Regions:
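Acidic/His- and Gly-rich active-site-bordering loop/insert found
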Residues: 3-104, 109-111
Length: 111
């Protein structure tokens, strides 16, 4: 498979799951959690990755999630990182009244 064919396959896969991906992003947006307190977000990420067939490891650096998808052949390995913590900004229009947090930094756009 060429690089362009792989890119096309990935784009098609994302397009097929568009509503699910948007729903996850919306769920994270309305449930902001401060850094090292993203327990519900970590559960959501781990559960979603498991639904996609990844093996997950949770509790890394408190709320981190590692997801691994083994291929049929060895290598190459691709690594991605994402941050989904929010900020304590009490005056943000989408602040969570319970936590005082909001996704005001753009991390949630990684979804």
């Amino acid at each position: 498979m060429t690089k362009d064919e792989l890119k096309q396959r990935i784009c098609e896969s994302v397009d097929r799951r568009r509503s699910q991906i948007e729903g996850i992003g919306d769920q994270i947006m309305v449930n902001p959690e401060l850094g090292f307190k993203e327990f519900e977000t970590a559960k959501l990420v781990a559960n979603t990755m498991e639904e996609f067939g990844f093996q997950t490891e949770t509790g890394l650096a408190r709320t981190g999630v590692k997801a691994v998808l083994k291929g049929k052949n060895p290598g190459p390995t691709v690594a991605l990182i994402g941050e989904l913590d929010s900020l304590g900004v009490a005056d943000h229009p989408m602040v969570n009244p319970e936590t005082g947090a909001a996704h005001a930094c753009g991390h949630n756009a990684q979804i």
